[in-house]
Structures are given as structure tokens and as C-alpha cells.
């Protein structure tokens, strides 16, 4: 275990630093910004990059607005999954996480994500801060211990987290369901409820054993958390959807949180409790502060070692802003603020939550080649292109972002190449050919007014960036780019260049056009930093602030223009998708479930990259007689309605036309696989018509829709031939 000081790739250090002092009366802010920690058990993929790009854009924009920002992240490096994977690969957990850290930092740096410090949760700084918070909670009477019964793997001699146990659902009897809930019918249960449970690690039948566990009494903080929620809501630090979800959890009651795991486990041992380790979700968020401590100790960004205490004390005026995905809301808005408050420390200023990434309208898929790792993308396409496309879709809500490959290609080619870069490419040559590479010394009144209007319009982008409404900012930028291109087209400098009497007018047209280009570049810089840097090199300047855009740049030399961006070739996208299929074939080293820790908000692993492979999955089920099969009344149903179920993260509600049987309402646990349920309307599906109706808190489910796959996002509805009619029996 060590500090990650001195190991950070240069790109993580080159864009950062404290903003200059502001002399214009603007209130400047000092902000610590974090992204959720990637789990050190797999590669970074484009789903991860959505968040890292979102937070990096925000940090860059806030710095260009004049604020001081410190930007940190780390690998989440603890847990049973890492311990078991290291064992399977024949290396130590430390060696495993070190190799993953190097790959993660390289991927992030190559995407232009400029962390001031990128650490690991397996550091001395994190151990010390985690112990400090735990001991403060304990001293305050907010912890307790009690015996719990858990399933134990007698072969591996270890207690099994819920996600390491599979078996038959006690309700719908679907096979190979995880120990915390059925992904087919949506029922929540404990591992002890499973029928014929087995260990995902060894395949052995688990035994029920008792162990002492440690808990944080979350109910102690209910009043504080409700007050914090109200304050953050009123200050814009929590989105409405998050507030609504928190209120649901409050209504259900806050239960004590089990924060311990038994040896063997890779993590931090609880002080004074040999053989007991902190659950990964205890030390993971503390990793934000540990990474910041290491940054303070380094002396970079104008920080000093004692600045950590200034930042984390309860009355700190600095801000702490987290960017996370919607699957880990529970941990960041209940456990984390409670832990901090209980330790006498400051709570988060804002928790900014984003939706999931889909590709071509569906969940990322290994078989379709749309489960794309960051490195695979980088091997084929420019990272600024993805940054821009994500920006055109990112809004302040929890809406999912779809990477539609056709739209991606068209938007990049049209907006970045056709609208932005095109302005400079059409005018720069004339400045060098006729005017010695120098812009005009002044602009006439009409042109000055036109520039001022464009600059004023784009100044609204500062507030849009701050509000994380990047999509609106990009629309405004494209609008001004269209106006600039219309100006160039209307004046046709290529025609003016043929008439020597129009040289002065040509100089004015090219100067205004290139200032439009500069204006757009300044406002695009947080989104496409590498391309913007090349554009600024061409313009021979490096503006650090948005307010540099308010005045045109005149009577200065520019450099020779060279291509700043090229159009995306469809073949490159196709090659990337093919490479994704190849890089994720079964012969790759995968193996144990990547995350045993389900999020209470969603019931799914908060750090999962690839679905677990059951060692018993290939074992055939016991044979049944034809009479047993004949008991099932399988029918074709036509989907009349399909939508999300409020209050459930797993279920979709179907209304089927079942022919002579009338209409059937069925709740199906396939939400993870179908994020756009409205697209299922009109489809034929196969369902069990004679399953006893089941009363759920959402309504009565009148059957079961059949699907193929291993569960979670790997589920695929069974189709019936187009000739099949609603209500027809399936033989």
C-alpha cells in the first residue's frame, strides 16, 4: 500500500491549477470535484467515460469562468471480487490493482480527462481517513454489533456476499438468480430463501453460519439527512428525481447499515476487530478525500498539506461536488452524508446524477459489439468526437444518453467539421496570401456590432455549463456557427479574392470570420480540449477565460492553417464495433462476478462491468415428463402497452392482447435489458397464461413473459412468427 504521488500521467497535471484572482467583482468559488470511482476489476468502457467526460467538461468550464477547482478521482480497489480474480490469475491483489490503475489512468488521460490527482482506495491516506471516520462514529454511539447468519462456502472457507450466491427463485422458480433478488419476476429476498443455492465461486452448496457484524445506525441521522436534503434541494444541489427517490427511502424507514465483511477479504481491517474488514462502500467514498489529501500534500494547485482540514471541516466555505451514476444514489445521498456528519465533517454541496449509456437504443452488448472499451474506441476514433457527441446529449436530469452510431457520425461531421472548422479553413488562406498572415487592425461598425451580438449570445453558455445543460450550450454554439457560415457564404471571400479592388473588404470579412471561429473555439474548449488547443495554436493565443471572447482579436498574426478535424469514416465505426466483438470473446480472462455489492437503489452491482458466469449454468435441469410440460399454457401475446414501473428499478409493466383470453397485465423483471419500453409496443411475445395471478405492490401480475439469457441486461424476449396471432397457443 502506498501513496499514488508522483505517478500521475502528465496530461492529468497540465490543464489544472488554481484560477487567477478575479478583479472584476465576480464571486469566485473554490470547489473539490469528484467522479465515481471505477472498480479495479475491469477495463474502463464508454459507460464509464460518459461520467468522466461530463465531470471533466464541468471542471474545465468552471475554471474558464474564473473559479478555483480541484479535480480528483481514484480506482475503487477493494472487495471479494478483486481478491478472487487475483487468486485466479495467480497474482496478489496489489499486483492486480496496480496493473488496472495504470490502464485506467492511461485511458482517462488519452480521453483528455485531466484529473489533478488520480489515486487508489488502497492507500495509507485512505486507511487513515476511513479509520478516523469510523472511530468518530463509534465514539458518537452511532455503531453497533450483532450476530448475523450468512451463507458460507465450505470449499473456499469464506462467507458469501449475496451476489456470489445463485439458485432458484422462491417465487417464480427461475433458475440461476442472485441471492438478493430475482431479475425475472423482481422479487426481493435473502440468500436463505433461494431454492437449491450454490456458490458462484466454487459451485458448492453453501452452509448457514453465524458471524458478528458491525453496523452504522443510519436512523440516528434521519433528521439530519432530511434537513440536508431540503437544503441541497433548495440550493440546486440535488435533482428533483433524486429528491423524490430519497423521500421514498425515508418513507420506507432507514435501517442500520452493515459495514463489515469477514476474512478472507481484500480491504481495510476494522480497527480493533481482527478478521473483520470494512465493506467496500465504506472506504470507497472516503477515497475522494484521501485523493484530495494526497493532492494537498503534493503542493500542486496552490494547495498546502493543511488545506485538507480547511476543506473538510463542518463550517468549510469550499464546495464538494460529486458526479455519479443513478445506480449509486443511495450510497452518496444517505450513507456518505451520514458518515461525514457523524464524524463532525462537512457534507457534499451537490451530488450530480446522470443516466446510463445505451448504444444504438439498447443496453451495451458484447455480442453486438456495442460494449466498447475506452481503449478500443481510442484505437479507432478521435476522443474529442465522443466528448462532443456526449455533450450534445447531456442535460441536468437523469435521462439516459444514447450513443446512436449514425447520429454520432452525422453530428460530428456536420457540427465540428462542417460548421466550426470549416469557418477557418475557408478564410485563413486568404489572410496569409494577401495580408501577410495578419488580421485587420479594426472592424467597421456593422461588423463590430455583429461580433458583439454573437459574443453576447454565447456568454449564456457559462450558466448552461454550470447547470450541466451541455446540450443547450451546444445548440447555442451551433446556432452561432450557422450564423458565421451564413456570413461567409453571403460575402464569398473566394470571389472577392479575384477582385483586387475589394482587398480591404476581403480583409474585414476574413478577420470577422476568423474571430467568429475564435469565439466558437473558446466556448467549445471545455468539450473538445485537444482540438481547441490545436485551433488556439493556429490563432497563436491561449485564452484561459471565457471573458476573453467578449472582444475580437485584431491586428495580430495567425499561423498557417492545417486540418484541425477530419470527417468520421463509417468504416472506422464498423471496425471499432468488430474489434469490440473480438476483445470480449469468452476466451478473455473473465471469471468471477465483478461486484458482489448490490446497490439498494437498484438491486444491481454498483461496480459491475460484465455479468457473472455461473459454474453451474451448463448443467441441465432435471428431466420432466410430457405431462408436466403439458400443464403449461403457453400463448402468444401482442404488446399493447409497455412502460416503467414507478418505484421499481427492475420491472416493466406490460398489457398484452391475449386473444380470446382478453387483456393481461404482466410485470416482468427485464427493465435492465429494455430501457425504451415503448419500442416493444406491437411486438408478439410468448407468455405463460395459466400461472396463478400474483399480487404485487404495483398491481396484479397475470402471467409470465418468456425471455432468453442469463439475466440482468442479458435478456431477450422470445418472438413469435409474424403469422402468429394474439392468444394462439404455443405447441
Residue ranges and their predicted role:
Residues 607-731:
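Phosphate-backbone binding interfaces of nucleic-acid-interacting proteins
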Residues 532-593, 607-628:
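Intrinsic disorder at enzyme termini
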Residues 361, 477, 513, 529-531, ...:
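Hydrophobic, well-ordered secondary-structure elements that form the walls
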Residues 1-25, 582-616:
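Intrinsic disorder/low-complexity segments
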Residues 38-39, 177, 221, 264, ...:
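Short, glycine-/Ser/Thr-/acidic-enriched flexible segments
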Residues 27-73, 125-129, 172, 195-433, ...:
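Structured secondary-structure scaffolds
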Residues 407-443, 453-558, 688:
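Helix-rich, typically C-terminal accessory recognition domains appended to large enzymatic cores
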Residues 23-228:
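N-terminal, positively charged nucleic-acid-binding surface of large information/translation enzymes
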